[in-house]
Swiss-Prot record:
The keyword Metal-binding applies. GO terms for cellular component: myosin complex. GO terms for molecular function: calcium ion binding. In molluscan muscle, calcium regulation is associated with myosin rather than with actin. Muscle myosin contains two types of light chains: the catalytic light chain, essential for ATPase activity, and the regulatory light chain, a calcium-binding protein responsible for Ca(2+) dependent binding and Ca(2+) dependent Mg-ATPase activity. Pfam families: EF-hand_7. This chain binds calcium. This is Myosin regulatory light chain, striated adductor muscle. The modification Blocked amino end (Ala) is found at A1. Residues 15-50, 84-119 form the EF-hand domain. SUPFAM superfamilies: EF-hand. Ca(2+) binds at D28, D30, D32, D39.
Length: 156
């Protein structure tokens, strides 16, 4: 597995590896070089979620062993290459949708994008949400993922 995982390092652009390193560092709250259940719980709580033990275990099961940076890169490299399925994108938004309304406050989403991870600029934000389905300040992520993935399905 390590051989396959280290091959990821040669496939990804240096900038992307650096961004992933920053993301990993944010998630590795206790700074031990591995992401564990406590790290996932802490980062989730910082994002306003309180996942239960079962959810945290499911997240960690994606890795075939301890989740160090190389394994983290390996797992997420496919996602970085733009191969996320519509369902994967929808599930990513759903993590922030505790009431399961299929809609999120647009200001909350913009705040996340401006202040975490990629740090979107105002221009990037405008382009991203130019055609986004927003009604009454609520961002419809089901319609949005259908739009960007081209399925044409408006309902899940």
């Amino acid at each position: 597995a390590d051989k396959a995982a280290s091959g990821v390092l040669t496939k990804l652009p240096q900038k992307q590896i650096q961004e992933m390193k920053e993301a990993f560092s944010m998630i590795d709250v206790d700074r031990d070089g591995f992401v564990n259940k406590d790290d996932l719980k802490a980062i989730s709580e910082q994002l306003g979620r309180t996942p239960d033990d079962k959810e945290l275990t499911a997240m960690l099961k994606e890795a075939p062993g301890p989740l160090n940076f190389t394994m983290f890169l390996s797992i997420f490299s496919d996602k970085l290459s733009g191969t996320d399925t519509e369902e994967t994108l929808r599930n990513a938004f759903a993590m922030f949708d505790e009431l399961d309304t299929k809609k999120l406050n647009i200001e909350y989403i913009k705040d996340l994008l401006e202040n975490m991870g990629d740090n979107f600029t105002k221009d990037e934000m405008r382009m991203t949400f130019k055609e986004a389905p927003v009604t009454g300040g609520k961002f419809d992520y089901v319609k949005f993922t259908a739009m960007i993935k081209g399925s044409g399905e408006e309902e899940a």
